[in-house]
Amino acid sequence: THAHIVALSQHPAALGTVAVTYQDIIRALPEATHEDIVGVGKQWSGARALEALLTEAGELRGPPLQLDTGQLLKIAKRGGVTAVKAVHAWRNALTGAPLNLTPAQVVAIASHDGGNQALETVQRLLPVLCQDHGLTPAQVVAIASHDGGKQALETVQRLLPVLCQDHGLTPDQVVAIA
């Protein structure tokens, strides 16, 4: 519609991508609305996020994640191109042992500014935080599922022992603060 064109006109790269690949986007994401596509395109590097969805959506819809259109759009809109590519690249590592994350957990982590960094940090720190510090995978995911998830996870790893032993906080309280 005219309103969608106006919204995308502030993002020339996305407008060009949508103009050239709109039918391909609809084929790759058949449940996506015009508003969904414009919502991704309006983001910083939205054109690249749409292009990443075009190339990665097919495999992300299949095992092990089996993401639906809404989940794919959420990652692209909130986490951007780097999150879409990270989820694609690490889908087997994230869902396999020892992490065993669910698709919903992967989407929750990836759907934020810095989602790709949070996913990378979860791969590195989830086993450590669970085995060495007694956190549950759900607690680690909760910490990672916000803007700045990487930094929050690294801070919890560094300060959890001090906060619990020296200051009497429980792990649940530290997770709530993080």
PLM feature spans:
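Non-catalytic all-alpha helical scaffold/repeat segments
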Residues: 1-178
